[in-house]
Amino acid sequence: ATGMATGCASSGQESGKSKLVKIAVCVSDQTPAAKAMTDVFKPMVEEATNGKYDLQIYNSGVLGSEKVTYDYTKSGIVEVCVVGTSMWSETPKMAIPDFPFLFRDVEHARKSYQGELGTYIAQDLESTQPLKLLSWFPNGARAFSSNKKLESLDDFAGQKLRMPNNPIHVKLAESLGANVVIMD
């Protein structure tokens, strides 16, 4: 399972009387994380602040890749980002949620993120980066997609798989015998 984190920098642009808050979401607007941002987070913040903030959500990576939007958030170009594993290179503990078979199910992952594990990882991120971790989104189990049926471990041998630039995911696929093509 992969934890998706939302980070927040402190700068922003003014938009009329409301402060414009740009939120970069690298996944499709049809995913649970994007829907949570649009359907829950945005109205909750706007209502709780009486319109002080105008949250503009940019889904599907329109503001850039995870790494780009993470860097934008650190530099204040974007106020909030929803990203997966792009934070690892600078904060290695962010890799912990990516280990295979770490969580029994989504509820176990959620409790772990909201408990000691999530606090431990967030404190490390916040002590090394100019960010504040606002929330975790369990991203489900790792799945492999292929035009060829992958019904047994033998089916992975020589299978070309596109993978995110994530050493844990890549090593898992390679250990199954797949030929990995890294996507950035």
Where are these regions (language model features)?
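Short helix-initiation/N-cap motifs at beta->coil->alpha
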Residues: I57-D71, P164-I168, V181-D184
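Second-shell loop/turn segments in exported
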Residues: V27-T31, I57-S60, H108-R110, G158-Q159
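Short, low-complexity disordered leader/linker segments with a strong preference
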Residues: A1-L20
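Short helix-capping segments at alpha-helix termini
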Residues: E46-Y53
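Periplasmic binding protein-like
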Residues: S65-G84
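Short, well-ordered beta-strand segments
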Residues: K22-A24, Q56, C81, R162
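Contiguous mixed-secondary-structure segments that line small-molecule binding/active-site clefts
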Residues: D39-E46, E79, G84-M183
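Extracytoplasmic "Venus flytrap"
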Residues: K22-D39, S60-G64
